[in-house]
Amino acid sequence: MMAAALADGETVIDNAALEPEVIDLARLLNAMGCRVRGAGTPTIVINGVPTLHGTDYTVIPDRIEAGTFLLAAAITRSTLTVGPVIPEHLGAVLTKLDEAGCRLVQDGTNLTISAESIQAFDLRTMPFPGFPTDLQAPFMSLLATANGTSVVVETIFENRLQHVAELQRMGASIRLQGNTACIEGVARLSGAPVRGTDLRASAAMVLAGLAADGVTTVRGLEFLDRGYANLEDKLNAVGARIRRLNDPA
């Protein structure tokens, strides 16, 4: 879309993603003088322009970051208010948190989550508006502490279950078969040295560490920092105890 905005003529993108971020980018490009139609549908049409002009624009809240903070409350069985959020962008996520037994209350652009006991549930990643693959790993940390057995199926990316081995180091009971993980919840996780193998796996390790007994050391912060701004500071502000080490060894 960005390349097509300044290309000669008309560009048609078929099988386009339906994610809110795509719609938001189209709105920004239109505000800068481009002509984009169809964002939010499988077909997007872009009529390029010679130049774009400046504009003031507020991007939508990060739904994956919001989901991560909701999970931080759920995995620690806490109450937390997260905002600003657009609940419609988190529909599949909120449905699963509701299945888990969390209480969710919306107040304008804020969501308050309360969690006491987490029940097992199944999930399958799907393109938006389905369950986001970017929250599969963080949700698996939650399911590792749930009551009962859960099944997680990853349908979007290959090799996106590498965090399973790291959760197992913390005492999680998980069996893998292809792109499917079967998680038997345990009463407590145990702190351990772990490594985030990608952006969302790193966040999953931090969440697991919040709920674990003892100290958890997470490596792979180069991945974490690519998708979260000052994650540890935000979590510490609501009661976490996280220190960033220059050399965790």
What feature does the model see in each segment?
Residues 1-249:
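Short, structured segments at the rim of ligand-binding sites
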